[in-house]
Structure formats: structure tokens, C-alpha cells
Amino acid sequence: SQFKKIPNKIKLINCVGGGSSAYGFWSEFIDYNKKQIELIGVEAGGPKKSKLHAAPLSKNAKIGILHGAASYLCQNKEGQINDTESISAGLDYPGVSPIHCFLKDTKRARYTYATDEDALNAYQLVTKHENLNPSLEPSHAFAEAIKIAPRLSKDTIIIVNSCGDAKKDRDILRERLGK
């Protein structure tokens, strides 16, 4: 309602672990043309120096069964669930909701990942320049926004769902950033 009409180019960026906050954020926009409203999900890429991650969609995992549902999973060749690693407890999960598998397979949403280091850098930038205190989950989404913003036209609007407060991440932030 602020714009009186939907702008022509919008990027809706959300972190994706299990996927409920992303789908809730995107659900009103699913039927819009993807050239007008792009849905971008950002998974936990884990530490840069580790092979472990929690990014089954963006790291081309295979379909498997977890909790009775078929979805892309971090798994080994025998179908056993792999360990995952992420600075963000809320994103440290080996699977994703089947709705995100559908959105990926139909190319309605694009999925990527941010490393722990990317998320920490984004957290610091957002905290300093926007006076927000995002949790580590949306810091992954902010990392993607920071990465793509310089390449976008000036009429493109980026909206990041900041779906959590850093109070719960206080100990991790103190350990990693000395704050």
C-alpha cells in the first residue's frame, strides 16, 4: 500500500533452514511473475574451511526421506543423514521443507548460501549502518543482499526478512567478534 502498486523489480530475500519463515514471507507473492518479484532463499554454507554445511538446495543435494517427507537432504551415498555445521542454530538442519524443493524445481525461487564468515560480516554491517540487531539466521540473508546490491539497477528494491533478534546469539557473537 505504501507504493500504491507493486514495483517492477523486487528481490525478497530470506534465510532458509527448514523453510517456514521464508515461505511465510513469500506466500503472498508466489503467483507474481518471477521477473517482477524474485524469491531468494539463503541457506547456511557453514564455515569456509569446512566441508560441512546446511545447504541442501544450493549445494545440489539429492532427494531423500527425513521425518517422513521427501526433500533435498545433506546425506551420504547410502542415504544416511550427514552432519551439518552452521554458526546459526536455526539454520543448522540437514533438510528443507518440501515446498522449497518444489519452488526450486519449478525455478520459482532461487537458492544460494552464505558462509558463517559472510553472515558475521553482514551482521556487523547491518548493525553498524542500519541500527538493527539481526540474529545470525537473517544475517545470512543480509549477506546475499550485500553481495547482489552493487549489480542491481537503481529501481530494484531489495527486501530482507529480518526474522530474529541477536539476543539469543549473544554468546556466539562475543566468542567470534569479541562483542
Cite the ranges covered by each PLM segment.
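Glycine-rich phosphate-binding loop signature in dinucleotide/nucleotide-binding domains
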Residues: 3-8, 152-154
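Phosphate/ATP-binding catalytic cores across multiple sugar-kinase/actin-like superfamilies
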Residues: 1-3, 147-148
